[in-house]
Regions:
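Subtilisin-like serine protease catalytic core
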Residues: 11-24, 29-43, 51-98, 115-119, ...
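Short coil-to-helix leader/linker segments, especially the first N-terminal amphipathic alpha-helix
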Residues: 1-11
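Residue-level marker for well-ordered alpha-helical positions
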Residues: 6, 60, 135-138
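Substrate-binding/access-modulating region of protease and related hydrolase catalytic domains
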Residues: 13, 19, 85-178
Length: 180
């Protein structure tokens, strides 16, 4: 481990809190499936509508932050990843549809997984309020909650009542400084 993910994450790892036994689902852009940071943690990869598209830096960054071996918050967690067409992410119904498809796929898969492999968290780098498809996404988040899955998204305030908007620290400062 030669990189510090910051926010005191290393001290958690030193205490044995590494994500072992945790299963994380991600719906994002096409993934570099052989990336050294997370390829050993990738348990399932499903590619919807991205054939021929290049892999995305965003999806790889999200996977690395989640389960990366040197920068991950939970480097021993398992990763279940659904890839969607990056051109479809945005503000319209056609943008919401791939997120609905990906989240539905993960929730359906979760019902088939053995207890020890069931998802604990799903990350979606997408937010919604009154967009077309927003009601359906909110219903899927409720379905996830009923299954004991926490859904991290840009709509976390609307779905969980949490007002979270970042660390508000200087990115050039000590990555473990949480005083801001």
């Amino acid at each position: 481990r030669n990189r510090n993910p910051g926010l005191g994450v290393r001290s958690l790892h030193e205490q044995g809190i590494t994500g072992k036994g945790v299963n994380i689902g991600i719906v994002d852009n096409r993934l570099l499936t052989d990336h050294v940071e997370y390829k050993g943690r990738l348990k399932m990869y499903r590619d919807f509508n991205t054939w021929g598209e290049p892999a995305s830096m965003h999806g790889s960054a999200v996977a690395s932050i989640a389960v990366g071996s040197t920068v991950g918050v939970a480097p021993e967690a398992n990763l279940y990843y659904v890839s969607q067409d990056p051109a479809k992410f945005g503000e319209t119904e056609e943008c919401t549809a791939p997120v609905l498809e990906g989240l539905t796929y993960l929730l359906d898969l979760n019902e088939l997984l053995p207890e020890e492999d069931k998802l604990d968290v799903i990350s979606i780098s997408y937010g919604w309020t009154e967009k077309k498809g927003g009601e359906e996404l909110t219903a899927l988040v409720e379905r996830a909650k009923e299954a004991g899955i926490f859904v991290v998204s840009s709509s976390i305030k609307e779905n969980y009542g949490m007002d979270f908007s970042g660390t508000s620290r200087d990115p050039a400062s000590n990555p473990d400084d949480r005083s801001a």
